[in-house]
């Protein structure tokens, strides 16, 4: 299958297969009905990155992607069917402008798109050369024509001609949340499925109460809707870019019960265990929190051993996983103290092997 294609006629089959794989993989931990959430069959991806291939015969640039599982094979991309409607609208216009301008094309090696459901968009042009004032003048004309935000980047140089972020609005149980999503920050790529993930997490935690600890909070994606269910939320994140966006998003959404600490999960575990003191926690009294629940959305590596031990101290665990294999490993450890009461599958990446899962664990 060519990268970026959307064979919509196969969607139902591949989704059913993912449900069965998930049921089989977690049968030792859960035997109830899986909460399974579909994706749109096409135009679901809100961000995309393309290599730029310069044809030596024609001199023209084209979009390209690596062929999955085939080393050093680059495939030209004519259409990106899984991309949002806004990405597909922008792609030919951006490429035409690049091919009509020596300044824009010279040593251009990558183009990135970040879009929102509103049509807001950031396009980043990335170069193997310094960017001049002449480049900036031409890029400003292109930005005006495209009606989007344009960024130029090269080594140790970034020129943002407007904003370097989009504003996304997601609907969770009839309430809208607005998010700043920065072009270099992590965001969920499938907005439609992201809304379903947020709604599921908020719904299944509605009756818990108490205070919430969140690790790996990113830009506050889950933090904001979950804060509706808890008295107070303490959220941690190590990325400075994400922390800055999270603080912006908390203010824009009028949330008053959320505190953010820039710590890794390992550092926070040390703080909770009183192994180390952190200046980044000097305005936060950990002992004042009455934590009932921990929420984690870790990277593919899952939770490290110490964080698993930390999570096991909470009555309720909400775990969103982008890697079912490491989730299963972590559940094997947590199963001694907790039982899985809900299991969800979110089809973030149709037509791939990728499965996003969610589990609720309650103390035995």
From Swiss-Prot:
Q: Name one GO cellular component term.
A: cytosol
**UniProt EC number:** 2.1.1.-, 2.1.1.35
Q: Where does S-adenosyl-L-methionine bind?
A: 188, 216, 221, 237, 297
Keywords, A to Z, come to:
Methyltransferase, S-adenosyl-L-methionine, Transferase, tRNA processing
Q: Which InterPro entries match?
A: MeTrfase_TrmA_AS, SAM-dependent_MTases_sf, TrmA_MeTrfase, U5_MeTrfase_fam
Recorded hits in SUPFAM superfamilies, A to Z, give:
S-adenosyl-L-methionine-dependent methyltransferases
Question: Gene3D superfamilies recorded for this chain?
Answer: 2.40.50.1070, Vaccinia Virus protein VP39
- Please list the reactions this protein catalyses: uridine(54) in tRNA + S-adenosyl-L-methionine = 5-methyluridine(54) in tRNA + S-adenosyl-L-homocysteine + H(+); uridine(341) in tmRNA + S-adenosyl-L-methionine = 5-methyluridine(341) in tmRNA + S-adenosyl-L-homocysteine + H(+)
Q: Name one Pfam family in it.
A: tRNA_U5-meth_tr
The GO terms this record gives for MF are: rRNA binding; tRNA (uracil(54)-C5)-methyltransferase activity, S-adenosyl methionine-dependent; tRNA binding
Q: What class of enzyme is it?
A: transferase
Record's keyword annotation contains Membrane: no
KW Methyltransferase (keyword) present? yes
Q: Where is the active site?
A: 322 (nucleophile), 356 (proton acceptor)
Task: Name a biological process GO annotation.
Answer: tRNA methylation
The protein's superkingdom reads Bacteria
| The family this protein is said to belong to | Belongs to the class I-like SAM-binding methyltransferase superfamily. RNA M5U methyltransferase family. TrmA subfamily.
Role of this protein: Dual-specificity methyltransferase that catalyzes the formation of 5-methyluridine at position 54 (m5U54) in all tRNAs, and that of position 341 (m5U341) in tmRNA (transfer-mRNA).
Listed NCBIfam families: trmA_only
This chain's protein is named tRNA/tmRNA (uracil-C(5))-methyltransferase
The organism of origin for this protein: Teredinibacter turnerae (strain ATCC 39867 / T7901)
